[in-house]
Every structure is written in structure tokens, then in C-alpha cells.
């Protein structure tokens, strides 16, 4: 509790410099779900990976970032390079070899492009309900991917929380509201 309160009194950190190296992408189909409050750089968990196309030209990845609905995606990073931003789109011609579909956790259908490309391995039943995730389609490019698969991370605005003062639910970095949400959450928190 004290940790969250002390964070509220410290100036807002530069997420790009201080948080790089803290977000590590993992591969585990049965990985536990993360709860994310406030703004955070998340490495995510690769829950599906498949090559498609002639000569395995494309690599598809499904990267789960939170086990609940989130407010928004702000940016996507490959290693320490920002490749996509919510207001600018793709950087440095990354849009030529990468396409990203974002799901905030409120989706009711599976990613249709992946369903079409996967030869029935990823089906319409793979909706990942109540999970925030990204679907990335990477085109083989020896120049862009010279060191192999990059560490993929994203800066997100996490879980929406209830503000009992006005009975509204919205994204917040207020530590008291985040703690209140965690304490009363019957799925992930301490409530029964």
C-alpha cells in the first residue's frame, strides 16, 4: 500500500528510458494473467506463434498483455525502438513489414485475419475474452529483423477502476482508486 502512495508523490518517470529492460516478452500458452493498473510498459506473453505464406514469409504472434480490459495502447516497442505510437502510427517504415491489431479486452470475436491465415489452428473460438492482447504479423525482412525475433513490449493504460466519489468507471493512475479496485475485485483481488 505504501509503495503505491509513495509513487503518487514522485514526479512522473520517463517511461522510455527508465522502463526499458524491465519488460520481457515470454512464451507460455498457460501463463498467469497480469493485472495492470495505471500506465505501464508490459512485455506480454506470446500465447500463439505461427509462420505462414510461401517460404514462411510471415510470422504471426498473439501477445497477451493483461488478463482484463484495458483503457488503451499508447506505443509498441521492438527491443528499445518505438515502432508504433497511438497518435503517429508506424515509425521508420515499420508499417511496411509489421501490422498490428489491438484488442483491449472487450472483444467478442477472434482476430479475423489470423483465423483466415492459420489453416484452422487459430479459430473463431479463440476470442481471448477478458484479455487485452495484440496480434502481430511480421513480414520476413533480413534488414529489419537482423538479430531475429525482437523483444516486443507495449506501453498501455491499464485497468479501468471505479471512483466511488462520482460512481464512474474510467482509467486512473490514482493509487487509492487502484488499491480500492484490487481489494474489491472478486476475480483477481481480495474480495470473495
Enumerate the language-model features and the residues they cover.
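Polar, S/T/G-rich
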Residues: 2-192
Amino acid at each position: 500500500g505504501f509503495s503505491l502512495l509513495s509513487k503518487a508523490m514522485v514526479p512522473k518517470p520517463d517511461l522510455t528510458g527508465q522502463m526499458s529492460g524491465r519488460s520481457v516478452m515470454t512464451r507460455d500458452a498457460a501463463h498467469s494473467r497480469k493485472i495492470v493498473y495505471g500506465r505501464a510498459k508490459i512485455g506480454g506473453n506470446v500465447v500463439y506463434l505461427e509462420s505462414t505464406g510461401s517460404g514462411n514469409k510471415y510470422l504471426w504472434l498473439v501477445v497477451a498483455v493483461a488478463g482484463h480490459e484495458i483503457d488503451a495502447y499508447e506505443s509498441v516497442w521492438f527491443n528499445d525502438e518505438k515502432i508504433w505510437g497511438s497518435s503517429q502510427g508506424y515509425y521508420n517504415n515499420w508499417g511496411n513489414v509489421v501490422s498490428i491489431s489491438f484488442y483491449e479486452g472487450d472483444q467478442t470475436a477472434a482476430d479475423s485475419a489470423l483465423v483466415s491465415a492459420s489453416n484452422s489452428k487459430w479459430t473463431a473460438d479463440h476470442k481471448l475474452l477478458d484479455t487485452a492482447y495484440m496480434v502481430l504479423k511480421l513480414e520476413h525482412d533480413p534488414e529489419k529483423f537482423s538479430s531475429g525475433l525482437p523483444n516486443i513490449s507495449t506501453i498501455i493504460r491499464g485497468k479501468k477502476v471505479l471512483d466511488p466519489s462520482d460512481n464512474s468507471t474510467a482509467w486512473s493512475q490514482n493509487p487509492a482508486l487502484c488499491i480500492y479496485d484490487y481489494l474489491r475485485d472478486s476475480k483477481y483481488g481480495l474480495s470473495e
